């Protein structure tokens, strides 16, 4: 009986850890900007990162922006040089000469990324 109770407690502890890991706070990104522009137009893009923490032990470690498979912007953060807040925004300008796929992704130093955000811009 004691063995089965101990085994049950162990299983609950493992499941609890797995559930917490699955819902751990990962850095998430959103992209705001126009979706259709004239060829040659320089457009602003707002990249917003959302994270639950911004302390010396738990913060967004990096943010990168890729346009048509080429990295066009990157910010790296450290314990001593963290983002200004748990949620923050970066603005970039990009000249659109052809249809573009812009991908932004950020990563938490402990839990990783929720995955990339994708924004498509079409040339009229």
Regions found by a protein language model. Give the residues of each.
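C-terminal segment of classical bacterial N-terminal signal peptides
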Residues: 14-21
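Short acidic/polar inter-strand loop motif in beta-rich domains
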Residues: 106-117
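Extracellular Ig-like/FN3 beta-sandwich strand-entry sites
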Residues: 42, 97-101
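Beta-strand signatures of extracellular beta-sandwich domains
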Residues: 61-66
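Aromatic sugar-binding surface patches on proteins
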Residues: 82-91
């Amino acid at each position: 009986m004691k063995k089965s109770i101990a085994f049950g407690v162990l299983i609950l502890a493992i499941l609890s850890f797995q559930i917490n890991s699955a819902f751990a706070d990962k850095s998430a990104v959103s992209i705001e900007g126009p979706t259709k522009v004239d060829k040659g137009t320089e457009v602003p893009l707002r990249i917003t990162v959302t994270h639950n923490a911004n302390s010396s032990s738990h913060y967004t470690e990096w943010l990168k922006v890729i346009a048509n498979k080429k990295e066009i912007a990157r910010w790296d953060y450290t314990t001593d040089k963290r983002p200004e807040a748990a949620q923050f925004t970066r603005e970039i300008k990009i000249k659109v000469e052809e249809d573009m796929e812009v991908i932004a992704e950020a990563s938490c130093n402990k839990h990783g990324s929720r995955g990339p955000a994708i924004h498509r811009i079409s040339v009229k």
